Amino acid sequence: MIKANDPNRKSWIEVASHSDFPIQNIPFGIFKTSEKTICIGSRIGNYAIDLNALHKLNYFEGITLNPDIFNKETLNDFLKLGKPVWRQVRDRIAEIFDTNNAMDESHKIVVLSKINEVEMLMPVKVGDYTDFYSSRQHAYNVGCMFRDPNNALLPNWLHIPVGYHGRASSIILSGTNIHRPKGQQLPP
């Protein structure tokens, strides 16, 4: 079993029973503190965890990590390290915040931020992506927009995966305001 996912593990950080972020679910993300510091972090309960601060305090000792791996504005470099390293870091976070381990109060002040006092940011810089027509209904709807409903699905759609290049700039955070065009207008 993955140590971080042990269902019997409990955290010394108070976690509501209905929380999406118990000690068994250790996500990675990017947040900005009230002091405007951008941090690679994680979350347990209602607290954001500054992984760079943990790293500087030697909590990741024994895990092969560059000194500045968590001193970035995106997760891209950390993600390149691969699943074995992610798992080691998650296991260590679970160990650090386990009820069997205590953290010095001066470390808590540096490492933890209340989640309602931070702003979540885009976790990765997306360079490019390919999207696929994986849903028949989606492909049909798009086909109706570009062709007529009688010829919405092209014959090849049922036989090969149809992919298309997507614009990385179209990937945004939930809740971001979007300026929607009002359509084309003829010049006056």
Residue map of PLM features:
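Active-site microenvironments in enzyme catalytic cores
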Residues: A4-T33, R43, I49-P188
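Glycine-rich N-terminal segment of FAD-binding domains in flavoprotein oxidoreductases
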Residues: K36-T37
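Short, surface-exposed charged micro-motifs
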Residues: I40
